[in-house]
Amino acid sequence: MAWPKRARTVNWESGVLILDGEKRFEVPELTPEIMEQLAGYTLVGFHVKGYPVTDELLATFAGHKSMVNFGVEDGALTDACFPVFSAMPKLRYLMLDGNAAIHGSGLSALQG
């Protein structure tokens, strides 16, 4: 797969990765290498639905400077994910619906 030089938004659902709403790639799983590639872009939006994204996979996004909108729906995140989001200075929208292992004990990491 030939990755584009830049991307601003990422959406993954049902094995299809869409960059900037138009560039489509068949990506059946989000490997650590793919997540690193995506975290290397100057993204403002990232959304994954129906993939077991873990806290470890998410770690590559820690400190992402331009991220405004981030969502992982029906993933495998836990309360340990919140420090990754607290290190995103421009983050304004966070959607974590369907991550059954999130109970709220990590929310204090977002206060600041």
Region spans (language model):
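Concave beta-strand-loop units of leucine-rich repeat
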Residues: 4-112
